């Protein structure tokens, strides 16, 4: 009984909004008539005690079904038989037993978790998201326009710079040629006049001029005169003749290179021959010096031998004279 009352108290405290489950407990005693008729049943009353449970499971039903269940209460009877006899139950729903635990007050109830959001917050969040989307679209469009305009500006600037460079190059080249042309004409006129007046000039004056100019300057003047005459001749000739002359110049350069190689090869051979001849002459000189030394030594040796012989002969003559005198 105490356990069932505790369950009732626990269920009422746990359920806040839902209707609480009703647990009704009733005990009935056996009628005195049955006890008087059968003495064996009196002994079994304490052992075969029974109780009645009335439970309304409103938590697992819809609200309409809950209302129906509250209006119509079903009574379930449990019968316990002993010696094939049925004992009736007595309904004590009108007089529920009061337990000391029902007097206790339930503690304060707190809502620990709130998963639901208010409708106002959801509407405000939706409006914010829409505003953000519109602002992002506007920003992207502006960026695209700025990039296209900047690209066009850079392309136009590059084109203008290219045109300015080409115009600058053309203007500079024209100015350069306009400045060089009179100088070139003057130099050509001077060269032509000098070539015309040079044959009429007297040889004495030429010799004086040559005597006054050093030899190095003369060679430089000759080379410059040749190059100028060649350039002047090329300037007045047709392109076909120029090509022919360029080919001839290339051939002359090739032939001169071949001749130079031959000369260097022959020069190396001549140098080797000269080195050989010098080595042979040096060896001959060494041999001659050695032979002269040998002849000198031989003459010396011979003179020494002759002197020794003469000394021996003199000593022998002296000995003979001494013997004769004795």
Curated annotation (Swiss-Prot):
Q: Which GO terms describe its cellular component?
A: cytosol; plasma membrane
Its annotated function is as follows:
Positive effector of CLE45 peptide signaling. Post-transcriptionally regulated amplifier of the CLE45 peptide signal that acts downstream of BAM3 in the regulation of the transition of root protophloem cells from proliferation to differentiation; thus preventing primary root elongation but stimulating lateral roots development.
**InterPro entries per the record?**
MAKR2/5
Q: In which tissues is it expressed?
A: Expressed in roots.
The stated induction of this gene product is: Strong accumulation in developing sieve elements upon CLE45 peptide application in a BAM3-dependent manner.
Query: Where does it live in the cell?
Result: Cell membrane; Cytoplasm, Cytosol
Q: Which GO terms describe its biological process?
A: regulation of cell differentiation; regulation of root development
Q: Which UniProt keywords apply?
A: Cell membrane, Cytoplasm, Membrane
| Region described as Disordered | 188-239, 267-326
Chief location: membrane
UniProt miscellaneous comment: Less stable in procambial than in phloem pole cells.
Gene knockout outcome: Partial suppression of phenotypes observed in brx mutants such as reduced root growth and smaller root meristem size. Reduced sensitivity to externally applied CLE45 peptides in term of root growth suppression.
Name-wise, this protein is Membrane-associated kinase regulator 5
> Which residue stretches does the UniProt record annotate as biased composition, category Low complexity?
190-202, 270-305
